[in-house]
Amino acid sequence: MEERQTCDLAGIWRFEIDKEDRGFAEHWEKRRLTQTITLPGCLQAQGYGDAISEDTPWVQSLYDALWYQRGEYAYAQENGTKVPFLSQPPRHYTGKAWYQKTIFVPEKSDGFVGRLTLENTKWKTTLWIDGECKGLSLIHISEP
């Protein structure tokens, strides 16, 4: 029976938000990203993205467009916008982001098959290894 090894990738990753969608054209897969983020975790909870305001798209679509003027939300005026949801994200961002992690595979890895599992990504994921595209996944399971 073949021995199965796992590598926990939780921890600090290099990271950058690609708000202007320049990453592919500028080959960000070949450069060292400049910011850091802890995974697992979401970027909004770690201070990335835009501040929540009345202009945030999903806030604008609330049924009661003037909800922030109602008395029960007066507490929010001092500390910034609060929305009438049980769980409010501290920041808002739904665009592209790049994540980068260095791992080492032992040289004695003939027949190595790697499997990368990512949770809670949106839309699609592209996997790069050593600057080379290894796959695009819409179901978020990729085996290079």
Regions found by a protein language model. Name each.
Residues 1:
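Short, Gly/Pro- and small/polar-rich lid/capping loops
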Residues 5-23, 41-142:
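Accessory beta-strand-rich segments of carbohydrate-active enzymes
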Residues 24-40:
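Short Gly/aromatic-enriched secondary-structure transition segments
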